[in-house]
Swiss-Prot record:
Belongs to the tetrahydrofolate dehydrogenase/cyclohydrolase family. It catalyses: (6R)-5,10-methylene-5,6,7,8-tetrahydrofolate + NADP(+) = (6R)-5,10-methenyltetrahydrofolate + NADPH; (6R)-5,10-methenyltetrahydrofolate + H2O = (6R)-10-formyltetrahydrofolate + H(+). CDD domains: NAD_bind_m-THF_DH_Cyclohyd (cd01080). Pathway: One-carbon metabolism; tetrahydrofolate interconversion. Its EC number is 1.5.1.5, 3.5.4.9. One of its GO terms (biological process) is methionine biosynthetic process. This is Bifunctional protein FolD. The lineage of its organism: Bacteria, Pseudomonadati, Pseudomonadota, Gammaproteobacteria, Alteromonadales.
Length: 284
């Protein structure tokens, strides 16, 4: 068996095209154009790349994109003050603060300062809580994008044994909640997990988000499983690879996401979907 590739790049482009059409329809109806504020603190190269991609995608679908680039030395109070002003700005539907933040700024304080109706990253405890209670509104972007990828396979998720490897607030934990909502029997694995191999080998669906190249050997993948690889790791030779040993896993899986071109584009597409949702549901 050779796995079918889940083409995140193509699916994300399809979403962006639909969003662009909706923005055009809003303009023609005399409605306001959705606005996203993107805040970057410091000059971390990876963060600059991510932020650049988000701003470019915004412009592509016709959203208003406002950029706020702050110095690394920016105080926590300065950042919170900016968020307060964006919370009250009627032209802004979504506020995104690029993580990680410098050590002197507390991530959780910043996340909780963003109004839940403008939390298009889906990180606010209110929005995570809504997902936990099976009434999601603004959902965490990467897990939301992954669910779109899984749905694209046409596989019925109800009753699947799913394993999530990684328990971060950004991916692993909300991913577990998304899979529960989709009817999966879900196991979340982390650094204290025993018998990881045993759990992976019986999984119908595996989502891996640990940031370690080739962390999951391909031979662990159950024949016919769906493999979602969230990792994006650059090797010393410059090659980008995921957290799963791709070549071997692709021989066992029924569907697999490539790295790059799998999950990454979907995170940004989901961010754009959330921004339009916030405009339509909360701010029109």
């Amino acid at each position: 068996m050779t796995a079918q590739i889940i083409d995140g790049k193509a699916i994300a482009q399809s979403i962006r095209t639909k969003l662009s059409e909706k923005v055009t329809a809003r303009k023609e109806a005399g409605q306001r154009i959705p606005g996203l504020a993107v805040v970057l603190v410091g000059a971390d190269p990876a963060s600059q790349v991510y932020v650049g991609s988000k701003r470019k995608a915004c412009e592509e679908v016709g959203f208003i994109s406002r950029s706020y680039d702050l110095e690394t030395s920016c105080s926590e109070d300065e950042l919170l003050s900016l968020i307060d002003s964006l919370n009250e700005d009627p032209t802004i539907d979504g506020i995104l603060v690029q993580l990680p933040l410098p050590a002197h700024i507390e991530d959780s304080k910043v996340i909780e300062r963003i109004r839940p109706d403008k939390d298009v990253d889906g990180f606010h405890p209110y929005n995570v809580g809504r997902l936990a209670q099976r009434i999601p509104v603004l959902r965490s972007c990467t897990p939301m994008g992954i669910m779109t990828l899984i749905k694209s396979t046409g596989v019925d998720t109800y009753g699947l044994d799913a394993v999530v490897v990684g328990a971060s607030n950004i991916v692993g934990r909300p991913m577990t909640l998304e899979l529960l909502l989709a009817g999966c029997t879900t196991t979340t694995c982390h650094r204290f997990t025993k018998n990881l191999e045993q759990k992976i080998r019986i999984a119908d669906l595996v989502v891996v988000a640990v940031g370690k190249p080739g962390f999951i050997p391909g031979e662990w993948i159950k024949p016919g499983a769906i493999v979602i690889d969230v990792g994006i790791n650059r090797l010393d030779n410059g090659t980008l690879v995921g957290d799963v040993q791709y070549d071997v896993a692709a021989q066992n899986a029924s569907f697999i996401t490539p790295v790059p071109g799998g999950v990454g584009p979907m995170t940004i597409a989901s961010l754009l979907e959330n921004t339009l949702y916030a405009a339509e549901q909360y701010h029109d």
